[in-house]
A protein has these predicted regions:
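Catalytic beta-strand/loop cores that center a nucleophilic Ser/Cys/Thr
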Residues: 110-158
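Structural signature of beta-strand start/N-cap positions in the alpha/beta core
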Residues: 1, 24-25, 45, 73-75, ...
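Histidine-centered divalent metal-coordination motifs
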Residues: 78, 127, 167
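Short gly/ser/thr-rich secondary-structure transition/capping motifs
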Residues: 27-33, 56, 104-107, 123-126, ...
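N-terminal beta1-alpha1 cap of cysteine-dependent amidohydrolase-like domains
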Residues: 1-68, 79, 174-189
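Cysteine-nucleophile active-site neighborhood
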Residues: 44-116, 180-182
């Protein structure tokens, strides 16, 4: 079972749809309707933290759940990505340019969720906040960027935790299904 934390975003059920299409049983809970303890007691195989219209610290259990997930594979999307960065000490700051419904080419490290994806694939972005690159802690690797150097992907160096700033669940993102499939294959031999 995959646990999907809904940060009150319209894209949450796009994620639900894509993940279900990939054959996963998905349970959805709003970020203020379940505790971290209840999430962990469910023993999910994987966790996805959805996008949302606020900051990570306004996103209910999102940041504490990232800190508590341990070895449960976890993917953060947009706000979920920012929650991962925030949980490990990165700063979330205003982006130089607000990106609502705009695509950008994504350069990546071809590992983890990006394994086998084309370089510079187009991804849709809906955000006004970003992770400040000078604040990324040692245990986090930057895995993807825009041509201007904005962080579009991060990965924990020792835990199965990744985040993407863009929206793989949007039809406007090339290879979105494959990126999510790569996440679902974490820990599968």
């Amino acid at each position: 079972m995959l646990l999907l934390i809904d940060n009150y975003d319209s894209f949450t059920y796009n994620l639900y749809q894509y993940l279900s299409e990939l054959g996963v049983e998905v349970e959805v809970f709003r970020n203020d309707k379940i505790s971290v303890e209840d999430c962990l007691a469910m023993q999910p195989d994987k966790i996805v933290i959805s996008p949302g219209p606020c900051t990570p610290h306004e996103a209910g259990i999102s940041v504490p759940l990232v800190r508590s997930a341990g070895n449960i594979p976890l993917l953060g999307v947009c706000l979920g990505h920012q929650a991962i960065g925030s949980a490990f000490g990165a700063e979330v700051v205003q982006a130089g340019e607000i990106m609502h419904g705009k695509t950008s080419p994504i350069n990546h490290d071809n590992k983890g969720v990006f394994a086998g994806l084309a370089q510079d694939f187009d991804a849709i972005r809906y955000h006004s906040l970003v992770l400040e690159k000078t604040s990324i802690p040692d245990e986090i690797s930057v895995t993807a960027t825009t041509p201007s150097g904005l962080i579009m992907g991060i990965r924990h160096k020792n835990l199965p935790i990744e985040g993407v700033q863009f929206h793989p669940e949007s039809i406007m993102t090339e290879n979105g299904h494959q990126l999510l499939k790569n996440f679902l294959n974490f820990g599968v031999d």
